[in-house]
UniProtKB/Swiss-Prot annotation:
Gene3D superfamilies: Homeodomain-like (1.10.10.60). It is found in: Cytoplasm; Nucleus. Residues 59-104 form the Myb-like domain. Residues 33-56 bind DNA. Residues 233-262 are annotated as: Disordered. Involved in mRNA splicing and cell cycle control. Keywords: Cytoplasm, DNA-binding, mRNA processing, mRNA splicing, Nucleus, Repeat, Spliceosome. The gene is CEF1. This is Pre-mRNA-splicing factor CEF1. It comes from Eremothecium gossypii (strain ATCC 10895 / CBS 109.51 / FGSC 9923 / NRRL Y-1056).
Length: 477
């Protein structure tokens, strides 16, 4: 196996590489420099980008004019940043640097020569033309293809599969000529699918059990014949109906809506329910009685004139209403509102002692004197009250059993008078104590706490220093 040549990324750009770079940028754009570099084995993505931006990019090419030389001189004196200068002039940065070196005679600006990048480039072997031809052929093939890598791979796979299928057919044909029957093996992709040459598509196996198949063909034939006869009969009846159908009405015939309106119809009369026929008079009489009671309950009219009919034609109707009202009033009892009716007279009292007692209770209930407040009863009650007041109250057996005696109203008022003064004095004392605590005691306490903290810290430091001195003196002995 021949040795694989080792390429060093970099080196001088050749004319062929520049042409491949232009074609690759035209195909992949100015953002996929790794794809562009894949067509150039000796160059990286960064080198392809730099070569494109500085030299190969199709900017202004040709001879320099006097105005461009003046602009180049002004920009180069301010700071020779050749990318910015090239963007301002519309030329590559390398061309601007070379032009400035040509104008000033400074070769250090243009950079070293082409052969000075690699030391001892003259002693190295020349690049063989075979590698360059392979690079150009690969770039031409990749740039000329209109399909992607996946599409090309799938096309190759389809060609391989077709060639395999043809080979299997030729092999089977040869075996059949030799007298050996062999089925074509299914590919792996469709191994679990149905084979239309060997299987029955969508076959349903009959259920397990006794199943008679002797008369199955006869039953199928009879069912098909019955269906055909039914279809034929329906078709004949349909044709007969179409032949008997009347002809269509002409376009000038009156619309169906107008014909329907022109036909006279009797008014709709519904039968009256039997319940209303039987009880139709009873509710009317009850309503009339109720209205008559309401009219009787109204107060009497305050005007002293009668309402006379406007014309003589109204008198018969009024007389008829009066007759109806008189007829209804004949069956009604006189009725008055309860507020205007007097109380019924009391029943006659029963004779005897029980009757007297009953009369006394009734009189007391009506608002008269009590039945027991007779003069004798009143005198007896006063005597009992005087006797009870004259008797001295017995001393209590225990002091705790005595009932508390409430002070009089004057005593309570006298005791309540000095309370506002005492409340004001208490408020003043509380205010003075709060001020003393907030403005004097608490600040004094804070000051003393700080002094104590400072002195205690000084004491701790001094005690630590003394302990250190004692320890040193003890160690020195």
């Amino acid at each position: 196996m021949p040795a694989v040549p080792i390429y060093v990324k970099g080196g001088v750009w050749s004319t062929v590489e520049d042409e491949i770079l232009r074609a690759a940028v035209q195909r992949y754009g100015t953002h996929a420099w790794n794809k562009v570099a894949s067509l150039l084995p000796r160059k990286s993505g960064k080198q392809c980008r730099a070569r494109w931006e500085e030299s190969v990019r199709p900017t202004r090419q040709g001879a320099w004019t006097a105005a461009e030389d003046a602009t180049l001189a002004a920009l180069a004196r301010g700071g020779p940043q050749w990318r910015s200068v090239g963007a301002a002039l519309g030329r590559p940065a390398a061309a601007c640097a070379a032009r400035w070196a040509e104008l000033t005679g400074d070769q250090a600006v243009a950079g070293p020569a082409a052969g000075e990048r690699i030391p001892g480039a003259e002693g190295l072997p020349a690049v063989p033309e075979e590698d360059e031809r392979e690079m150009v052929a690969e770039a031409r093939a990749r740039l000329a293809s209109t399909q992607g890598k996946k599409a090309a791979r799938r096309a190759r796979e389809r060609q391989v599969e077709e060639s395999r299928r043809v080979a299997r057919l030729q092999k089977r044909r040869a075996l059949l000529q030799a007298g050996v029957n062999s089925a074509l093996p299914l590919p792996r992709a469709v191994r679990g699918q149905l084979d239309p040459n060997a299987d029955v598509l969508y076959e349903l196996a009959p259920a397990e059990g006794v199943f008679e198949t002797a008369n199955e063909a006869a039953r199928d034939r009879a069912a098909r014949e019955a269906y055909e006869r039914q279809i034929e009969a329906r078709g004949k009846r349909t044709a007969r109906k179409q032949s008997r159908a009347p002809a269509r009405a002409p376009a000038t015939e009156q619309p169906a809506l107008q014909v329907r309106r022109a036909i006279p119809r009797p008014p709709l009369e519904l039968p009256v329910p039997e319940a209303l026929l039987k009880n139709s008079a009873a509710p009317t009489a009850a309503v009339r009685r109720a209205l008559a009671r309401l009219w009787q309950g109204l107060p009497a009219a305050k005007n002293d004139f009668d309402v006379a009919p406007e014309s003589e034609d109204e008198q018969p109707s009024g007389s008829a209403d009066a007759a109806v009202q008189s007829t209804d009033m004949e069956v009604l009892l006189p009725w008055e509102p309860p507020l205007r009716q007097d109380l019924p007279p009391p029943p006659p009292p029963p004779p005897g002692l029980l009757a007297e007692h009953y009369r006394a209770l009734a009189a007391a209930a009506a608002g008269g004197p009590a039945c027991y407040d007779t003069p004798d009863v009143l005198r007896q009650r006063e005597a009992i009250e005087r006797a009870l007041a004259a008797e001295p109250s017995p001393a209590m057996l225990h002091p705790q059993c005595e009932l508390p005696r409430l002070p009089s109203l004057d005593a309570l008022r006298a005791a309540a008078q000095p309370r506002p003064q005492r409340r004001l004095a208490a408020h003043a004392a509380t205010d003075a104590g709060s001020r003393l605590l907030a403005y004097e005691l608490l600040p004094d306490l804070a000051t003393k706490q700080r002094e104590y903290y400072v002195r205690y810290t000084a004491y701790e430091l001094e005690r630590t220093a003394v302990a250190t001195r004692v320890r040193r003196l003890t160690a020195g002995r």
